[in-house]
Structure formats: C-alpha cells, structure tokens
Amino acid sequence: MTPRGFSCLLLPTSETDLPVKRRT
C-alpha cells in the first residue's frame, strides 16, 4: 500500500482523501 493511501485511512480529512475517493 502506498503511503498516500495509508495516510488517507488514518487521516480521512487529509487532501489525499480527495484523489482516493475519486479512485474508488
């Protein structure tokens, strides 16, 4: 798992949540 995906799980409010949600 990439660090970005992991960070999103721990911090859903992170800016990484934006691209991750689009992927799913």
From Swiss-Prot:
Keyword Secreted (UniProt) = yes
Q: A single Gene Ontology molecular function, please? A: receptor antagonist activity
Let me know which tissues express this protein, per UniProt.
Expressed in skeletal muscle and testis.
Q: What induces it?
A: Down-regulated 6 hours following staurosporine (STS) treatment and up-regulated 24 hours following STS treatment. Down-regulated 6 hours following beta-carotene treatment, returning to its basal level 24 hours following beta-carotene treatment.
Q: Which GO terms describe its cellular component?
A: cytoplasm; extracellular region
Q: Spell out the subcellular localization from the entry.
A: Secreted; Cytoplasm
A Pfam family annotated for this chain is Humanin
Q: What does this protein do?
A: Plays a role as a neuroprotective and antiapoptotic factor.
Q: Which PANTHER family does this one have?
A: HUMANIN-LIKE 1-RELATED, HUMANIN-LIKE 4
Q: Which family does it belong to?
A: Belongs to the humanin family.
Its recorded name reads Humanin-like 6
Gene this protein is translated from: MTRNR2L6
